[in-house]
Every structure is written in C-alpha cells, then in structure tokens.
C-alpha cells in the first residue's frame, strides 16, 4: 500500500510518522490523509460518504485503494471535492439497497458521473462481463437517478512501479432516460463502451468527450492480453454459430491490422 501512496504523491506528515498526506493545490490546498497505523483514510472536510458528514474510512479490502486512487485522479483532473460522494446508497428493489462507489455531481448538485470501482484483473473482468450481459450494478443505479450523464466501470493497479488504469464508459443518450427499468435500458443500449474521454488531456471536468484511437495510442501486446483477446473472439464466434472459427479469427485480425496501417 505504501508504494501506491508514494506513487500518488503522498508524503509523510510533519511530526506524524505513521500519517501520509497529500495536498491538492488546485483545490485551495485541500488534502487527504492516510493513517498507516490505524489503516484509515481521511478524505478531508468536503468529500463525504452517502451525503453524511463522515469522511473517514477504514481500509478493509483492496477495492478501497482503487476508490482512493480514483478520487485522487478526479481531484487532479479538476473535479471539486464537494462534488464527490462516496458509497452513495440507492434502492435496488425488493427492500434492498446498493452502494455506488463514487458519485460525481455537477455545480447544481445533480448526478453527473457514476463510477463503480473494481480491483485489477478478475474482479474488473467479471464486472465488465456482467455489464455486457445485463447492465450490472451501474444500470440499476442509473434507474434511480437519471440525471447522470456518464457511467464508468473503473480499475487501477501499480504495475512495475507505474500506475495503470482502465475505464469502460457509457455515455447516456436521451432515449435511455425514458426507460422504465434496467432491462428496458439494456435493450435500448447499443452495447458499446468507450475507454477514453474522462481523464484524458483533451477533456475538461464535467465535460465528456471521447475520441477514436490512433496509432500513437497503441501499446505492445502482452501474453495475457493475446489470450484474453483470442478467448473473446472465440466467444463472439460461438455466439454467432461460426463453424470455421480459426479461419474467421485470422480474417478478422487481419482486418484490424489493415485498419491500423491505413490510419498511419
């Protein structure tokens, strides 16, 4: 955990050996503190849990650190701390409720962005599969607050001393606001997510803008990535009852390569 905090820019607080602090100069020196001895996060005097006045959280699971890193990224991007609500409670039906990890509101205190945080790897992939299957938690929460403009499935991890993050983003279209339930929303959704437009250099806070990928956005493929891509292709081909799967895979992959070369 300490390596992650240092990579985020936290430093030891003066005269407090077990407390790390990070000031955010773009928010009038707003700060977040981490008490290593108590395993506790103090999100400051403007970021609260579920509209309460509580800003403290005990770190009990790895996902808590993903939420912390996401909040840090939001603050650095320019989102105001008073517009960030943690563990926002929404009814989920049949007398139950769920907690949205992060709700970002706009200047009018209306929902702008709903963020569900997951740990890197299996948990994120599982949530992404659920999202594509029936909408998952994010679609359920949106049905309770249709002012939201963006739904985000988010993860991050410190890999080889470099902080990596992924986000799958759904831009809310006006027709989605007219849906009566999660299934109706899911049926109308075009099943397409974006992976940029929230934390990129070209966009500003409270304004979502996604862009098409270009060759400079490409990264070297890893062994685990190639296996993941292959398995996803096979899943799509099976779903569409394609018999000659290896040949179909090769042709689709070749088309992608041609498209990449054509964009250069």
Question: How would you label these PLM feature ranges?
Answer:
Residues 17-33, 58-59, 82-109:
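Active-site metal-binding core of divalent-cation-utilizing nuclease and nuclease-like domains
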Residues 61, 65-69, 97, 133-136, ...:
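Short, well-structured alpha-helical interface segments that form or flank functional binding sites
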Residues 70, 100-106, 111-124, 141:
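Conserved catalytic cores of phosphodiester-cleaving nucleases, focusing on short active-site segments
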Residues 85, 89-91, 124-181:
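Nucleic-acid nuclease catalytic cores
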Residues 54, 59-86, 256:
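Short, well-structured hydrophobic secondary-structure segments
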Residues 152-264:
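Charged, often flexible domain-edge or linker segments that flank or initiate folded functional domains
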Residues 1-61:
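Interdomain/boundary linker segments immediately adjacent to catalytic/signaling cores
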Residues 80, 99, 111, 146-149:
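Short loop/turn motifs at secondary-structure junctions
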């Amino acid at each position: 955990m300490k390596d992650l905090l240092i990579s985020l820019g936290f430093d030891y607080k003066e005269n407090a050996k077990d407390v790390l602090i990070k000031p955010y100069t773009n928010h009038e020196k707003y700060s977040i503190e981490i008490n290593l001895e108590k395993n506790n996060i103090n999100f400051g005097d403007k970021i609260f849990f579920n509209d309460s006045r509580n800003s403290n959280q005990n770190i009990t699971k790895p996902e808590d650190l993903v939420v912390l890193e996401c909040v840090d990224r939001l603050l650095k991007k320019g989102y105001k701390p008073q517009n960030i609500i943690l563990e926002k409670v929404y009814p989920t039906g049949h007398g139950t409720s769920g907690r949205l990890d992060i709700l970002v509101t706009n200047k009018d205190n209306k929902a702008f962005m709903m963020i569900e945080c997951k740990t890197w790897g299996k948990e994120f992939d599982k949530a992404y599969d659920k999202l594509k299957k029936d909408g998952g938690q994010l679609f359920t929460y949106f049905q309770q607050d249709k002012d939201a403009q963006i739904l985000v499935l988010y993860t991050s991890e410190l890999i080889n001393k470099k902080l990596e993050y992924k986000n799958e983003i759904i831009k809310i279209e006006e027709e989605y606001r007219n849906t009566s339930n999660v299934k109706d929303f899911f049926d109308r959704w075009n099943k397409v997510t974006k992976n940029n437009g929230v934390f990129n250099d070209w966009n500003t806070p409270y304004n979502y803008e996604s862009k098409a990928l270009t060759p400079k956005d490409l990264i070297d493929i890893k062994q685990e990535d190639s296996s993941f891509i292959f398995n996803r292709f096979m899943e799509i081909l099976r779903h569409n009852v394609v018999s000659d799967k290896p040949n179909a895979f090769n042709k689709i992959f070749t088309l992608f390569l041609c498209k990449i070369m054509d964009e250069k």
